Amino acid sequence: MDHRLLEIVACPVCNGKLYFNKENLELVCKVDNLAYPVRDGIPVLLENEARPLSIDEKHA
């Protein structure tokens, strides 16, 4: 994931900062506890495509 892209994208729910999870290829919003998929290098920033973070992921 290009770090320049991470500087300009935001969570579509709260407009907060997103963090890239390399292991799962997801952009994570720690405020809303949601993970958005990255498919073929393209972030899918749709609320209905996001998955809720597990309890373990929230505290990582």
From Swiss-Prot:
Superkingdom of this protein's organism: Bacteria
Gene Ontology CC annotations of this record: cytosol
A Pfam family it matches: Trm112p
Transmembrane domains' residue ranges: none
Family according to the record: Belongs to the UPF0434 family.
Protein name as annotated: UPF0434 protein YPO1399/y2773.1/YP_1194
Biological classification of the source: Bacteria, Pseudomonadati, Pseudomonadota, Gammaproteobacteria, Enterobacterales
